Amino acid sequence: MIGVIFGVIVPYIAVAIFVIGVIYRIVNWANSAVPLKIPTTGGQQKSFPFIKRTIYDRFDSPYTWWETAGRMLLEIFFFRSLLKNTRYYLDRVSQKDARWLWLFGILFHYSLLLVLIRHSRFFLDPVPSFVETLSEIEAFKGVFIPSVYMSGLAIVAALFLLWLRRIFLSRERTLSLPSDHFALILLLAITISGNVMRYFVKADLFAVKELLMSLMTFNIGHAVEVANTIEPIFYVHFALASFLLAYFPFSKLMHAGGVFFSPTRNMPNDNRARRHVNPWDPADVPLLAKGITVAGRVYKSKKLDWDTYYSMYTDQLQEIEEADYKIVPEEL
């Protein structure tokens, strides 16, 4: 009965919650307005022709969509922002290199990628050759029995380091929420139980693959039959993974999809060349004036009726009038 609950029912519920939750979050992000152009950058923005920009500036402060795409690729695959991580101390007027966080992040994410690729053998038949090759490369074949996979140990080490950072560093400890600790503990529990099943308490992997293939093909009857033959250690690992899958769309782990919708990352820094229209601006504002003329010079603004414009900038306009300048509405 436990095998049926945690091997058949719980996984289907978890996948359904995961799919619905991810779609909901993505649709919600896609429909969210971006009132301001706020790409975070430390590079030189494209300006006058005589101001030269380096390759670094092109990707850190992108002007075209191709440069923005390059920036996004660097962000997704190499964590560009974390690589520039520097901690500043205002009270001591000093700074400290904190790129160890980038190292921990790279170690965790790429170890997770390798682990997921290796786990794909349980869902595919036949197993692709590149999965077999990758497993051969990262395993210490002939040194240990059974073979030791580097990614399986590296992901546990990376998660411990990321969790210790939130525990022992005062600033991170103050900013950390219970959900931050919970996500790391859940990931640690999954990876540790997987390593225990790999090296200490064995499970019948042929039966595991048969169960997962039955779930993939919706062969419920066969899945129920196989589920009752698998050792309990597998269901500890599988239940934790199912819970993570259901929890994923409603946690900070959803940054895996949210990074594609982040305006600080996916917008070109072209404020000087293109005007960003705020989608929240009301569409029914009377379009009667587009600015003012002072001493023969036109100062453009939003296209408003003169009374509205004057009420918005009363103090500034009165100062200009007191300086004996004549103000003329710039008519359309």
Swiss-Prot record:
Localization in the cell: Cell membrane
Biological process, per Gene Ontology: anaerobic electron transport chain
Coiled coil: none
Gene Ontology molecular functions: electron transfer activity; heme binding; nitrate reductase activity
Protein's UniProt keywords contain Membrane: yes
SUPFAM superfamilies, per database record: Respiratory nitrate reductase 1 gamma chain
GO cellular component, one term: plasma membrane
Entries under Pfam families matching the protein: Nitrate_red_gam
InterPro entries xref list: DsrM (IPR047660), Heme-iron_electron_transfer (IPR051936), NarG-like_domain (IPR023234), NarG-like_sf (IPR036197)
Keywords, comma-separated and alphabetical: Cell membrane, Electron transport, Membrane, Oxidoreductase, Transmembrane, Transmembrane helix, Transport
Chief location of this protein within or outside the cell: membrane
Residue ranges crossing the lipid bilayer per the database entry: 3-23, 97-117, 143-163, 177-197, 230-250
Topology relative to the membrane: Multi-pass membrane protein
Self-association and partners: Consists of five subunits: an integral membrane subunit, a cytochrome b-like subunit, a cytochrome c subunit and two iron-sulfur subunits.
Function per UniProt: Has menaquinol-oxidizing activity. HmeC and HmeD subunits may together mediate electron transfer from menaquinol to an unidentified electron acceptor on the cytoplasmic side of the membrane.
Protein's UniProt name: Hdr-like menaquinol oxidoreductase cytochrome b-like subunit
Organism (species): Archaeoglobus fulgidus (strain ATCC 49558 / DSM 4304 / JCM 9628 / NBRC 100126 / VC-16)
